[in-house]
């Protein structure tokens, strides 16, 4: 009985809410009926005639001034709306109407009704959004001295932003320094060098750190109580100084490789010494962790130098050995370097083996993983794929798998196809990328465009199918298909990472709000009316009268019908009651 009573109350409440929703129409017709009934006591006809007489006495200059003023106001509103939309990404009028006027008019936010039921889901999605907007180190980043600086010398443009370089400085301080650096003079100098903003000051500090190691220190060794001798001992080389010089001072890849080889000798010695002492305390453990990062970084960059110089097989071997020796250091994403090198060798079976290990649901995805998987599946069918034949006979199983892989990759990063299909021009990739963002798309396409071109028909298949992804995810910011909803923070972060001369790709495309379009149309229309009224006042007057008579013709027709239906003495009968 209690449940039945509660159900009846809910139905009654819903009926009342429904009736209140449409009650304003009843009020509107009631007001119209009362105005018609009270037209004689209120002297509506006399007032209308007075208004029409006043309007007839107005000169065309008044209408010109009126339309000009309204055009000016509409233009000011348009400028303000456009500025607000460019800055905040939404319409001011729309935001005010939704946020303030809608509650006053009885509108209810859908999110508030589901707030208590979806708090856990909201927190999970917020955490996912934060993780997806994290900036990552670009595993395929270029060399500053040998590549980025050469671009600046040729074009006069800076390919790296201050924000990107500042993130690199923070990475260097994290990987290459520790709390005990003050105990070794060279490391203390390098600790300051990584914080230095001026490139020349950093290079000078690296040379200073190497010069300190050239100074021979005398170590007193007592042999007998009556005499002593002096032993000459060389201090260990500073590996991080060689790293900085290889990255920023070397103007060619060959010079950078020589410096990295010197850094490898110094870094390997420091790593072996700290490995033996790592269990003697937290200080030695921190030193060993730092030396491990230095050694891995040097070996990875040496492999990249070999790849740049055309020794691809040697680079693949170095990367495989590095991944076996340090399997837990996933922060460098060495497998992405390995995938690119294997694609250059056209070792597609080895590429598939690497993907089978790293394209796992528990591991963070990347454009390299998703698009490489799509490339392998497209390779099996792309040479014989034809859109006309596929539309007649349908897609085969292999073609369907390839299309699904492309849709998966495009959903993860929708910016990549424009660069692979050369619809947008490429620039040098930044040192940091935002996953699923334009920066990641540039970094991927910069190195992998040649691999897609090498596979016959792969770009044709991509061109025919990539836009179909967007039909599956009509609202990508709210709900995804195979991945989480597309993060809304990518545009802001990419503008910080990419240089100003590059036009950042935005997804999904922001459409101009209705109020901006309406204001623009109103501004243009009133300005045109003001100009025409000023040039042709008599003709515009005739046109205005004809327009108003046509506009009010249906209302006059309805009023005549109402007068013919209702008796003329109805008002007197109502007053008698």
Swiss-Prot record:
Modified residues (Phosphoserine): 386
Superkingdom of origin: Eukaryota
GO-annotated cellular components: membrane
Entry-listed glycosylation sites: 47
InterPro entries the record matches: ST7
One Pfam family from the record: ST7
Range of residues in the leader sequence: none
Record-given protein name: Suppressor of tumorigenicity 7 protein
Gene: St7
């Amino acid at each position: 009985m209690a449940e039945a009573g509660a159900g009846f109350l809910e139905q009654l409440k819903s009926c009342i809410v429904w009736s209140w929703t449409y009650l304003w129409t009843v009020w509107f017709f009631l007001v119209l009926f009362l105005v018609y009934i009270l037209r004689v006591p209120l002297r509506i006809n006399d007032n209308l005639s007075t208004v029409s007489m006043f309007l007839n006495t107005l000169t065309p200059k008044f209408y010109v001034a009126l339309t000009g003023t309204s055009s000016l106001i509409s233009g000011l509103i348009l400028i303000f709306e456009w500025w607000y939309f460019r800055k905040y990404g939404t319409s001011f009028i729309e935001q005010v109407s939704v946020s303030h006027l809608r509650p006053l008019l009885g509108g209810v936010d859908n999110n508030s009704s589901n707030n208590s039921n979806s708090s856990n889901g909201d927190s999970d999605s917020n955490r996912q959004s934060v993780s997806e907007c994290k900036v990552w180190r670009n595993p395929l980043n270029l060399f500053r001295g040998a590549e980025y600086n050469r671009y600046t010398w040729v074009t006069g443009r800076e390919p790296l932003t201050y924000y990107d370089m500042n993130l690199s400085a923070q990475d260097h301080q994290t990987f290459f320094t520790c709390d005990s650096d003050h105990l070794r003079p060279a490391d203390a100098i390098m600790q300051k060098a990584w914080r230095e903003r001026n490139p020349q000051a950093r290079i000078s500090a690296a040379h200073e750190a190497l010069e300190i190691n050239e100074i021979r220190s005398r170590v007193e060794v007592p042999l007998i109580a009556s005499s002593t001798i002096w032993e000459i001992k060389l201090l260990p080389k500073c590996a991080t100084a060689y790293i900085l010089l290889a990255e920023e001072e070397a103007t060619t890849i060959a010079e950078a490789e020589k410096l990295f080889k010197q850094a490898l000798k110094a870094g390997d010695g420091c790593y072996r010494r700290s490995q033996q002492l790592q269990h003697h305390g937290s200080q030695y453990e921190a030193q060993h962790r730092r030396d491990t990062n230095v050694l891995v970084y040097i070996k990875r960059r040496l492999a990249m130098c070999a790849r740049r110089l055309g020794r691809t097989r040697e680079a693949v071997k170095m990367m495989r050995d590095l991944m076996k020796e340090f399997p837990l250091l996933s922060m460098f994403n060495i497998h992405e370097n390995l995938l690119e090198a294997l694609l250059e060798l056209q070792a597609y079976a080895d590429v598939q083996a690497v993907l089978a290990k790293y394209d796992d649901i528990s591991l963070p995805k990347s454009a390299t993983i998703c698009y490489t998987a799509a490339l392998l599946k497209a390779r099996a069918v792309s040479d014989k794929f034809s859109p006309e034949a596929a539309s007649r006979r349908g897609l085969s199983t292999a073609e369907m798998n390839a299309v699904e892989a492309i849709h998966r990759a495009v959903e993860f990063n929708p910016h990549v196809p424009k660069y692979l299909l050369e619809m947008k021009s490429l620039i040098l990739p930044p040192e940091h990328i935002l996953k699923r963002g334009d920066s990641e798309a540039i970094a991927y396409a910069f190195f992998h465009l040649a691999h897609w071109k090498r596979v016959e028909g792969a770009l044709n298949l991509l061109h025919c199918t990539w836009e179909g992804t967007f039909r599956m995810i009509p609202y990508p910011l709210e709900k995804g298909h195979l991945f989480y909803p597309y993060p809304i923070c990518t545009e802001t972060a990419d503008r910080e990472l990419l240089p100003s001369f590059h036009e950042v790709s935005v997804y999904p495309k922001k459409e101009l709000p209705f109020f901006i379009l309406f204001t623009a149309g109103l501004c243009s229309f009133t300005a045109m009316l003001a100009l025409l009224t000023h040039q042709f006042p008599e003709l515009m007057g005739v046109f205005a009268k004809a327009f108003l008579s046509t506009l009010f013709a249906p209302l006059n027709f309805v009023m005549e019908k109402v007068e013919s239906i209702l008796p003329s003495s109805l008002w007197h009968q109502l007053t008698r009651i």
